[in-house]
């Protein structure tokens, strides 16, 4: 799926996105709980880059948890970014946010950030070189000692365990209330439009972008966090 097709898809899904995936909140909340500890040592006035911020769930969580932080929200989908902006307005932290509609490479490299989140984004880059280049663009916008928290779907799709894990993941989504049509789209996307790679390979792509060796801090089903 090309960039514009992917952007159009998220534009179409923006209004119903949070409701559609609400049942998966326990996994999201577990990720955020560990994210808090990962970012706990950042400055009280840290600047955080949220790449592919979508409707702004992780931004809202961090804004409430760390009231002195400022955020740069980046997303190519105008509809998603509008919902993120509305969430910031309703949450009372709009003044601590700047919004950039577009892909990461169109965001100025300065000022630098103390941390970055990138959740379920890089997996849509099918070519390993493009994925490493994407992580390099994140690195260019981070200052010395900054921390990247990245999460993607990961597995060895050639292993016998993958089909069992995929079935379990689909059952989980179904029991969480994800509509059948969304499950069908997800299964098709995993085969065609998502680069599901072994966790060690994803970590290698991140490290190749000038980051230190990533440490995996999270896993729930297919979702891994480094």
Where are these regions (language model features)?
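Conserved class I S-adenosyl-L-methionine
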Residues: 1-43, 61
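Class I SAM-dependent methyltransferase SAM/SAH-binding core
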Residues: 49-50, 55-106
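A short acidic, Gly/Pro-enriched loop at the edge of an enzyme's catalytic core
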Residues: 108-116
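A short beta-strand submotif of the Rossmann-like class I SAM-dependent methyltransferase core
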Residues: 118-122
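A short glycine-rich, Lys/Arg-flanked "PGG" loop and its adjoining helix->strand segment in the class I
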Residues: 132-144
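Conserved beta-strand signature within the Rossmann-like core of class I S-adenosyl-L-methionine
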Residues: 145-152
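C-terminal alpha-helical "lid/dimerization" subdomain adjacent to the S-adenosyl-L-methionine
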Residues: 153-208
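Conserved S-adenosyl-L-methionine
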Residues: 211-221
């Amino acid at each position: 799926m090309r960039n514009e097709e992917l952007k159009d898809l998220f534009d179409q899904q923006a209004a119903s996105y949070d409701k559609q995936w609400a049942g998966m909140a326990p996994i999201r909340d577990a990720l955020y709980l560990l994210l808090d500890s990962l970012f706990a040592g950042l400055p009280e006035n840290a600047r955080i880059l949220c790449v592919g911020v979508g409707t702004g769930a992780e931004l809202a969580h961090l804004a409430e948890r760390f009231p002195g932080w400022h955020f740069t929200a980046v997303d190519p989908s105008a509809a998603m970014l509008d919902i993120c902006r509305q969430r910031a307005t309703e949450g009372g932290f709009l003044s601590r946010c700047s919004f950039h509609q577009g892909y990461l490479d169109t965001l100025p490299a300065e000022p630098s950030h103390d941390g970055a989140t990138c959740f379920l984004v890089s997996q849509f880059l099918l070519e390993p070189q493009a994925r490493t280049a994407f992580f390099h663009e994140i690195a260019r916008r981070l200052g010395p000692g900054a921390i990247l928290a990245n999460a993607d779907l990961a597995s060895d799709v050639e292993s016998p365990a993958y089909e069992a894990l995929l079935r379990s993941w689909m059952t989980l989504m179904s029991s969480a209330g994800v509509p059948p049509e969304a499950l069908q789209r997800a299964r098709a996307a995993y085969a065609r439009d998502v680069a599901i790679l072994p966790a060690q390979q994803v970590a290698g792509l991140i490290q190749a972008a000038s980051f230190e060796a990533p440490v995996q801090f999270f896993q729930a089903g297919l979702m891994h966090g480094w």
